[in-house]
């Protein structure tokens, strides 16, 4: 009762998405970014978090020639309704649509009269938008394939929830070490049995980078 969920990561070899100061554009090269846009065109919805939106003001569209009309519905998980009317997601909300998922009772004044569709769902134990509630609502709206492009917190949330079916991992041939920011935050692993388990389905060069495709599997 939920869409097929894909998580896209673009990192260094050691799994970093940005420097400690937040610089991230661009770790992977043009070919990997083009492949990422193709992934967007192949999904009904793209999911990100409000932290990414406030930091980067992304368009979250497919910008490949001939595929702009295949841009997915843009979905923002925004527990406290912090998305503003000046963001790209708000100013272009009609084409493609933008859906804002907030916790029930979140404030309403930030968006004004923009065309964003607001969707209220229950909160989880951390007072954040409940990921499973969002996925259920997306399925009810006819979404069958959703792509997650998000920061460490939301990526970790999807991994922890066990809802990531496919993982697309673009790795650049560079190493950042402890100076970098990890692609995923804490997912509550205290024992090896708690880890998220995936099986490698394919790996291929993409320009100077490498794409690894994994599918979710049960723990041994």
Model features per residue range: what roles?
Residues 104-106, 186-220:
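Conserved histidine-centered catalytic loops in small-molecule metabolism enzymes
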Residues 24, 107, 114, 179-182, ...:
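Compositionally biased, intrinsically disordered low-complexity regions
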Residues 144-145, 170:
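Secondary-structure boundary/capping motif
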Residues 2-144, 153-156, 220:
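Active-site ligand-binding patch in enzyme domains
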Residues 161-198:
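Flexible, gly/pro- and Lys/Arg-enriched active-site loops
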Residues 151, 170-173, 206:
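Short, loop-centered acidic/histidine patches that primarily coordinate divalent metals
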Residues 7-9, 169, 214:
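Preference for bulky hydrophobic residues occupying beta-strand positions
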